[in-house]
Amino acid sequence: MASAPDYGKYSEVLAKKMDPVVLAEIRALEANNDVANPRYMELLIPNFYNQHLMRLPEWPEPVNRMFKHLNGEIYTMMQGPSEFGISGRLSKWDRKADLPQLTLPVLTIGAGNDTMDPKHMEWMSTRVRKGTYLHCPEGSHMAMWDDQKVYMEGVISWIKNLDGK
């Protein structure tokens, strides 16, 4: 998304879809600055990540490897400690007004279950001069894995059509 504040607002839309009991426990951990508590990830993985980050029953090895090497300190510094809103250094980051300055072909990709608002991703494609939007209806944030056919066919088609842009 081109706006961290908009991303934060959309995370609240996703939060409202969660089991209220689970969300309340997540919010309590966040309110107590206890996101390092293993219980936080025990709640996030099945109730948020498995719904909006990666929708496969078993995550591919490269995804697991990425999480193993994720720099949590930097992630938290940029995003903030919560998956529901942005309070880190990117909290006010917003580049929506700059999108029309992009003159190269741009492919924005949204997914039906993404952590990023697919409507915002589609909107972005209309703001750049040579934008195309690809929607992966069954995908999540990692649609390249969990809606692979739509994702790969869409990216390949977009690349093949670049000469026309």
Predicted regions and their residues:
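Alpha/beta-hydrolase
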Residues: 17-100, 104
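Conserved loop-alpha-helix segment in the C-terminal half of the alpha/beta-hydrolase fold
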Residues: 96-139
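Short, solvent-exposed loop/turn and secondary-structure capping segments
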Residues: 7-10, 119-121
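Active-site nucleophile loop of the alpha/beta-hydrolase fold
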Residues: 1-7
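Glycine-rich, phosphate-binding/catalytic loops in enzymes
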Residues: 11-17, 123-127
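Non-transmembrane alpha-helical segments in soluble domains
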Residues: 45-49, 125, 152, 156, ...
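Catalytic active-site module of serine/aspartate enzymes centered on a nucleophile-bearing elbow/loop
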Residues: 130-165
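Flexible, glycine-rich phosphate/dinucleotide-binding loops
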Residues: 4, 115, 142
